[in-house]
Amino acid sequence: MISRLSIDLQCLSYDLRGFGESQSQTETDVDRGEPTGGLTSHLLDTSSSQFDSLYTPTAYAQDLVALLQELNITSAWLIGHSLGGTIALWAAALMPDRVQGVICINAGGGIYLKEAFEQFRSAGQRFLQVRPRWLSQLPLIDLLFTRASVARPLDRYWARQRVIDFVVADPEAAVGTLLDSTTEEEVNRLPQLVSQLKQPVYFLAGADDKVMEPKYVRHLASFHRLFQYCADNVIEIPDCGHLAMLEQPDAVAGHIRAIVNGQ
């Protein structure tokens, strides 16, 4: 995706704390008692409970705040996939002057379905418990990841990368993000968060996404002023599942470029 966008746009990607090449940390600025600029004091009646865990979307948004400040990036569009979309939304709320807009890919929600979420959390925990390092060396294991959560098979290169990312993720971070991002409180907070954002927010949905179905993407998008009456801030990509940036990279890059350059 970056290879397509970097032709005319400056791009920066990073691994979430505890994933990829980012090491899991033991504390955030909030845990250390360092100031966060008071940006959350008036937002959504935010309470300190959001920061009790290192793995809430808000805690990860604080990481992004620190990153942009450290790199002295004063103007940026945030693009996030799935949970990354939620993190981008929170970061936009925390940095209204730095963040010019948000593009969420395969991200939505804002409706807490108790039974469905309990099943998802339980199954997810069991799945994450079986992640031996040797799994990535298992012959043909990547073939399984070419078809998981997608509408069209991925190239084996990307499937292989999915396997590696899966097995190297920090155990605490993997479980923590699963549990802390799917609580009733966290899910129900999303619509109000989106409704209060002043920046433009767009949502790219996969027409065949079974993880985050388009109807749930449209639901969350409907709380933003750009939704209007015709889902003007939602773009549905055909023949696409939950990994739009890998399944339909040209289409996604085209939409991102049009949105960013059109503002």
Language-model features: where?
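Conserved loop-alpha-helix segment in the C-terminal half of the alpha/beta-hydrolase fold
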Residues: S3, Q196-C240
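Flexible "cap/lid" loop of the alpha/beta hydrolase fold
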Residues: A93, G101-R133
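Catalytic histidine-centered segment of alpha/beta-hydrolase-like enzymes
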Residues: C240-P249
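Aromatic pocket-lining residues of Rossmann-like dinucleotide-binding sites
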Residues: L5, A91-M95
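Gly/Ala-rich beta-loop-alpha elbow adjacent to hydrolase catalytic centers
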Residues: G80-G84, A88
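Conserved alpha/beta-hydrolase catalytic His-Asp/Glu region
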Residues: L113-A116, L135-Q196
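Active-site loop/oxyanion-hole signature of alpha/beta-hydrolase fold enzymes
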Residues: S3-S6, L12-I79, G254
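Structural signature of beta-strand start/N-cap positions in the alpha/beta core
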Residues: D8-Q10, T74-W77, R98-G101, P200-Y202
